């Protein structure tokens, strides 16, 4: 009887340990994506198209208030300054993971130079990433204009 109880106890501890490690892995991946998203905003502000080209998936799409563009078009917009993402103040971030896909929501105030003017707009930005080998690639980025009281549900 003691052997059975000890065996069950060991199985329970092993199962709980595995769940804790899995939870730590998810938290690590979430933090990695939060950091990557923040870096992306800085690369956009710096017009660092080399770093962005490596991040953007070949089939990526970018949805803005005035249109939808592919990877090449988005990089051209950034490089030429047609839209200059000067500063993204990130107020909140939420991440959801499912296998090799991740969705990152950013609640931001974006200062951008557009059509000759500086504009400040509140957005919730939805980013979809896909894990390829050991790297996350941005598949889609969508800007949704929102009120400044909008909250991301966690």
Language model features with spans:
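Bacterial N-terminal signal peptides
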Residues: 7-17
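A beta-strand edge to alpha-helix "cap/lid" segment located at domain peripheries
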Residues: 21-54, 59-154
């Amino acid at each position: 009887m003691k052997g059975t109880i000890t065996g069950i106890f060991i199985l329970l501890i092993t199962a709980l340990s595995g769940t804790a490690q899995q939870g730590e892995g998810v938290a690590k991946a979430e933090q990695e994506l939060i950091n990557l998203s923040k870096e992306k905003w800085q690369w956009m502000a710096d017009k660092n198209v080399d770093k962005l080209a490596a991040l953007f998936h070949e089939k990526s799409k970018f949805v803005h208030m005035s249109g939808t563009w592919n990877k090449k078009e988005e990089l051209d917009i950034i490089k030429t300054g047609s839209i200059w993402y000067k500063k993204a103040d990130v107020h909140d971030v939420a991440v959801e993971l499912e296998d090799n896909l991740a969705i990152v929501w950013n609640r931001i105030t974006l200062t951008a130079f557009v059509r000759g003017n500086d504009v400040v707009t509140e957005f919730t930005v939805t980013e979809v990433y896909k894990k390829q080998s050991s790297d996350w690639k941005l598949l889609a980025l969508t800007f949704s204009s929102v009120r400044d009281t909008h909250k991301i549900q966690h």
